[in-house]
A protein has these predicted regions:
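Condensing-enzyme catalytic core mediating Claisen C-C bond formation in acyl metabolism
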Residues: 5-91, 95, 177, 190
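Claisen-condensing/thiolase-fold acyl-transfer catalytic domains that form or cleave C-C bonds
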Residues: 90, 94, 101, 109-190
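Short Pro/Gly-enriched beta-strand edge/turn motifs at strand-loop
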Residues: 1-3
């Protein structure tokens, strides 16, 4: 992360998580109802690390431990236009949710819990408000974990289960955004 953007650096936490899925027993009732992924290329430059790979190698071709003198220092660090990304999320979010699960663009309806990626507290509140979802039905971890990028969704799911909020039989929507600008979401019964 580029230090001139220290205000953004304070949003990021650190974590790793995974979910292990198995076939539910016939009496359990757990189920994956819907899944969807979409990418909007106009947001490609909003969250990126331009360096690395073969285009802008970070390390010297002769010595992989030495910095490449031809490399652009700034290109090797994460860059984010948070306000621009949030604008694009709000522009496309309702349509994405409607395509994921009809009715989600207006309310949670039969969904018990929202388990969102949490880029920031402000972004989380703006998204919930735009979708008409009550904040008390969203599992919130941004205040304790920070933005753990892709790990934030399974970490937040775990927190919801461990705290006793999410129980067997609850229908949940898990969703997030990422570089690209990409959206991903699933609706499941836990």
């Amino acid at each position: 992360m580029r230090m001139p953007r220290a205000t953004q650096a304070t949003l990021f936490g650190d974590g790793a998580a995974a979910c292990v899925l198995r076939r539910a027993g016939w009496r359990e009732g757990s189920r994956l109802h819907a899944a969807r992924v979409e990418t909007y290329g106009e947001g490609a430059a909003l969250t990126q690390a331009r360096g690395g790979g073969t285009n802008l190698p970070q390390h010297s071709p002769e010595d992989h431990h030495a910095p490449n003198p031809a490399s652009d220092y700034a290109a090797n660090h994460f860059e984010m236009d948070g306000a621009g990304a949030l604008r694009l999320v709000l522009q496309h979010g309702r349509g994405f949710m409607e395509r994921l699960w009809p009715g989600l663009s207006r309310s949670l309806g039969s969904i018990t819990w929202a388990v969102p990626h949490q880029a920031s507290g402000l972004a989380l509140e703006a998204i919930l408000d735009a979708l008409g979802w009550p904040a008390e039905r969203a599992i919130r971890t941004i205040d304790t974990l920070g933005n753990c990028a892709a790990a934030s969704i399974p970490l937040t799911l775990h927190e919801g289960i461990a705290s006793g909020k999410i129980r067997r039989g609850d229908k949940c929507v898990l969703f997030g955004t990422g570089a690209g600008l990409s959206f991903g979401g699933i609706v499941l019964t836990y």
